[in-house]
Amino acid sequence: MIKNKFMALTLTVALTAGMLSGCGSSEKAKDRDAYRQYGINCIENGSYDDAVDAFQKALDQSVGSVGAEELDICYYKAKAQYLSGDVDGAIDTYTAIIDYNKDSDAYYLRGCIYFAKNDSDKGMKDFKTALSENDDNYELYLGVYETLSKYGMNDQGKEYLDKALKLKAKTADDYMQRGRIYTMLGDYDSAIKSLQKAIDEKLVKANYYMGEAYQKQGDNDSSQKYFKKYLDSGEADSYDLMNMGQAQMDNGNYDTAITYFQTALDLESVPNKQQITKAMIIAYEYSGDFATAKSQMEEYMKEYPDDEDAAREYQFLETR
């Protein structure tokens, strides 16, 4: 995941017009943080319009200079805008961040949205700018590859992976990211060697990617061994657990997949709750437990009534 980076700079006129503003009194800071948390909760529950409103109210609490908290809220606001269908609003928010501090993450994320709008020229321009601002960031190269691959530009995406491999690994995280790249390129031996270096340096997250490399290689036993190590560490987030569950789905291990999905839903923070809940329902269905699948789908439809695909799936489950 691309990580937010923040810079303490002077506020521009465009941002003071309401997009961004700074920290105020301690009371306003508490209100800001409360609105921020409420917005995050709304995203987790699929209430994206409410999330946008909450993040804007959080920003409205600020008076003075911009800090990391305000920029963090703007990133959340842009995410909520995109998820709500307000693509242009999300672009405007990322543009405001870019105008403020030229952050490479904002360029990258705006580029992703341009690709979603079928504007690959603007998307590529933003990707190139992001990498020019931060050309030693493995995660940026990986993100660019994944986006290009998603939109049918796999060969161009691989060029960015090759560029990333020309960087010199200096840290355990670097070795882990290189392992991810080798996995994407199908060079599993190199991936395992690189990931082992990261594991030897006590980077727990590398166990997850080691499990992924073995899973891609078809070695499910070794994959489970490393996934379990990562799960036992307590560091797995809901995205990791969903991916581990999906890997088990691919191998037909539906009960294990359900365990991963449920573990994810039991976490304190589950920003991808809707996707996990839906995946778990499918896992129950594939396992043959149609009664549980139907029961959970009923609860899902109450929480996410606008999901038309789920409504069609529910009609199918009613016939089982």
What are these model-derived regions, one by one?
Residues 19-22:
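C-terminal motif of bacterial Sec signal peptides marking the signal peptidase cleavage site
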Residues 33, 67-72, 105, 139, ...:
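Start-of-helix register in tetratricopeptide repeats
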Residues 58, 96-97, 129-130, 163-165, ...:
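Canonical positions in the second alpha-helix
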Residues 37, 69-72, 76, 83, ...:
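Canonical tetratricopeptide repeat
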Residues 44-45, 83, 116-117, 150-151, ...:
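Register position in tetratricopeptide repeats
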Residues 61, 65, 99-100, 133, ...:
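Structural marker of alpha-solenoid helical repeat scaffolds
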